[in-house]
Design a protein with these regions (language model features):
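Amphipathic alpha-helical assembly segments used for oligomerization, scaffolding, or translocation
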Residues: 1-158
Length: 158
């Protein structure tokens, strides 16, 4: 019934339930196991979208440190979730790992970096006096249509 627990957690939970000497003790051990099982499920849900996240511009054009923080948080979560090799982590430790994943995902700034690159490119365009208005308008459209920092920068250099 504790399908989200790794083997170490499951063994520990079963042991706590088996070793309880009162009904209240059994109930407390079961409640602890249930809460941990829920937290582990939430941790799994927190990384289920990792492949999608890693393909999005918000990740691919993010600062390297922010990409690393997300990747490391996911790797840490996967280690906890590993059925065979995961450690007997507490609910608080599991929740901290989920918080690490969520915080790192929310800190990804690839989309903001693309917006900044567009802003910089358009500002640079304004300084190019050798271009006529039609050329500037065409380049502005290309800048706006770009979806990555490299895409924006390739327009600037034309």
């Amino acid at each position: 019934s504790y399908s989200n627990l790794n083997n170490a957690q499951s063994t520990a939970a079963t042991s706590q339930i088996d070793n309880a000497t009162t009904v209240a003790g059994v109930t407390a051990a079961q409640n602890t196991a249930n809460e941990l099982n829920t937290a582990m499920g939430q941790l799994q849900n927190g990384i289920n979208d990792q492949n999608t996240v890693k393909q999005q511009v918000n990740f691919t054009d993010a600062d390297q440190g922010k990409k690393d923080a997300y990747t490391n948080a996911v790797t840490n979560a996967q280690g906890i979730l590993d059925k065979a090799n995961g450690q007997n982590m507490t609910k608080a430790q599991v929740e901290a790992a989920l918080n690490q994943v969520t915080t790192a995902k929310n800190a990804l700034n690839g989309d903001a970096n693309v917006r900044q690159a567009k802003s910089d490119a358009k500002a640079n365009l304004g300084t190019l006096t050798h271009l006529n208005n039609a050329q500037k308008q065409d380049l502005t459209s290309q800048i706006e249509g770009a979806t990555t920092v490299n895409g924006v920068n390739s327009v600037k250099t034309k």
